[in-house]
From Swiss-Prot:
Binds 2 nickel ions per subunit. Its main location: cytoplasm. Ni(2+) 1 binds at H141, H143, K224, D367. Heterotrimer of UreA (gamma), UreB (beta) and UreC (alpha) subunits. Three heterotrimers associate to form the active enzyme. One of its GO terms (biological process) is urea catabolic process. This is Urease subunit alpha. Ni(2+) 2 binds at K224, H253, H279. Substrate binds at H226. Transmembrane segments: none annotated. Pathway: Nitrogen metabolism; urea degradation; CO(2) and NH(3) from urea (urease route): step 1/1. It comes from Nocardia farcinica (strain IFM 10152).
């Protein structure tokens, strides 16, 4: 019997079961646990495309028509990295959704072909061999300040934006809110032609239930409570009452100055009801100095924003200026300066690293242009994982590879925010039936720059060379919009997430949009235990005088990183 070395097999078909892959220039390694497209014991007839290769007429390509069920696209031999596992497979896409994960090809000539992955004349091929495939990232904390954010998001592997804003207005620069029916309609129309799913948050800072219901009927997918609008206990309670009645999520930026109460008062106002706590560490805002303690509560779904990810020697220096600009403060006013300085605490930023590694903080978003960088959600997540591996070693269950840690961290920007906001029936993971919002990465550039971003099965963004060259690869190779980013295609492959009450009220007929409006799931019964691989609830204590943080009684010492991967090796600036 002819044999292939592992190295030769990887050259021909990509790595297989038992092979380990380094993620970019980090210390993180993944190991393929299963090869559904070939590999040991199943080698032969792997679905690969090209001259002299398998996927040709009467060989790997069958006669099956699209009407017979042939997929529109097959991604061959990709290593899927998702919260549920790390496996190699062929992935089929049909009508913009994932239709099969397994072995693709022609069942007339090949064994073991998945019935939903029968390649026919109508099937396009994307070579995933040697590449990593992930679900499109979900940024759960977006300030819609300028439209250029959309391009940066796509270039960073993001396919869904949750947040609010109306442009560079002071309210939007500070708070993640699209307030009122008129602004909601205009923003849903404005974002219709980008290949991104959109979920807008209305203003929850009011005791007027009528004002909140008005926003739900106008297209808000949930609410944002922000201290700059007044996150008082009364406003929190009123917003959560409407949320409980409507089924939507509430995101909270609590009261940094403790004017209307302390963290205990906010928790009392929440009264055990589910809530998404933004930037739980507190540098982005929230009760000083102990808002981080909410990550220990079962009804709180905590997230971070990326400027504090991970804790480095530069983190503190940049935060003060960022905060003054974002919250319309003046350094010449002592009270404004005191407000800013109260939010920047190295001890809680350091503890945030640990809480992510334990799975106690469940999500990571950007806080785009409002103390965060939308293009760095994915990158900052993996930098945090790298720093924690160096400091804490392997997680339980990990050894030569870091599969447990990698699965935990990828969940923070895929399935966890999808679950938290009621989007997981449509997006958030690489699973059959979900939208084909997928990102292909070359391992050397994993988390840094995608090879291609698929939105609803269409290639929307990709690394592409000079368009006047004779082949696609000559420099400069840059992330560029592709045909899937064209406005009609983007509308056909993307969703606006709204409340079911907006659909019942006929919102689709009132808006000048082409894309489909989809209702968010009811999230009001969610708890921390519903956050895959990120459901830890350790005891968290903060000393009110020294700001020392104890996690399950142990002090987590500050050791800011002096060097990071995924940084100047990849970027000029």
């Amino acid at each position: 019997m002819t044999e292939l070395s592992r190295a030769r097999y990887a050259e021909l078909f990509g790595p297989t079961t038992g092979d380990r892959i380094r993620l970019a220039d980090t210390d993180l390694l993944i190991e393929i646990t299963e090869d559904r497209s070939g590999g040991p014991g199943l080698a032969g007839d792997e679905a690969v495309f090209g001259g002299g290769k398998v996927l040709r007429e009467s060989m790997g390509q069958s006669r099956a028509t699209r009407a017979d069920g042939a997929p529109d696209t097959v991604i061959t031999g990709a290593v899927i990295v998702d919260h549920w596992g790390i496996v190699k497979a062929d992935i089929g896409i049909r009508d913009g959704r994932i239709c099969g994960i397994g072995k693709a090809g022609n069942p007339d000539t090949m064994s073991g072909v998945h019935p939903d992955l029968v390649v026919g004349p109508s099937t396009e091929i994307i070579a995933g061999n040697g590449r990593i495939l992930t679900a499109g990232a979900i940024d759960c904390h977006v300030h819609f300040i300028c439209p250029q954010l959309m391009d940066e998001a796509l270039g960073g592997g993001i396919t869904t934006l949750i947040g609010g804003g109306t442009g560079p207005a002071e309210g939007s620069k500070a708070t993640t809110v699209t307030p009122g029916a008129w602004h909601l309609a205009r923003m849903l129309e404005a974002t219709d032609h980008w290949p991104l799913n959109i979920a807008l948050l209305g203003k929850g800072n009011t005791v007027s239930e009528a004002a909140m219901w008005e926003q739900l009927r106008a297209g808000a997918s949930g609410f944002k409570l922000h201290e700059d609008w007044g996150s008082t206990p009364a406003a929190i309670d009123a917003c959560l009452r409407v949320a409980d009645a409507s089924g939507v999520q509430v995101a909270l930026h609590s009261d940094t100055l403790n004017e209307a109460g302390f963290v205990e008062d906010t928790l009392a106002a929440i009264a055990g009801r589910g809530i998404h706590a933004y930037h739980t560490e507190g540098a982005g805002g929230g009760h000083a100095p102990d808002i981080i303690t909410v990550a220990a509560h079962p009804n709180v779904l905590p997230s971070s924003t990326n400027p504090t990810r991970p804790h480095t020697v530069n983190t503190l220096d940049e935060h003060l200026d960022m905060l003054m600009v974002c919250h319309h403060l003046s350094p010449s006013i002592p009270e404004d300066l005191a407000f800013a300085e109260s939010r920047i605490r190295p001890s809680t930023i350091a503890a945030e690293d640990l809480l992510h590694d334990l799975g106690a903080i469940s999500m990571i978003g950007s806080d785009s242009q409002a103390m965060g960088r939308i293009g760095e959600v994915v990158m900052r997540t993996w930098q945090t994982a790298h720093v924690m591996k160096r400091r804490r070693g392997a997680l339980p269950g990990d050894g030569a590879a870091d599969n447990a840690r990698v699965r935990r961290y990828i969940a923070k920007y895929t399935i966890c925010p999808a679950v938290a906001h009621g989007l997981d029936a449509e997006i958030g993971s690489v699973e059959v039936g979900k939208l084909a919002d997928l990102v292909l990465w070359d391992p050397a550039f994993f988390g840094v720059r995608p090879h291609a971003v698929l939105k609803g099965g269409a290639i929307a963004w990709a690394a592409m060379g000079d368009a006047n060259a004779s082949i696609p690869t000559p420099q400069p190779v840059l992330p560029r919009p592709m045909f899937g980013a064209a406005a009609p295609v983007a509308a056909a492959t993307s969703l606006h997430f709204v409340s079911e009450h907006a659909l019942a009220d006929g919102l689709a007929e009132r808006l000048a949009v082409r894309r489909k409006l989809v209702a968010v799931k009811d999230v009001r019964r969610l708890t921390k235990t519903d956050m895959p691989l990120n459901d830890a609830m350790p005891r968290i204590e903060v000393d009110p005088d020294t700001f020392t943080v104890r996690v399950d009684g142990e002090v987590w010492a500050e050791q800011p990183a002096t060097e990071l991967p995924m940084a100047q090796r990849y970027f000029l600036f």
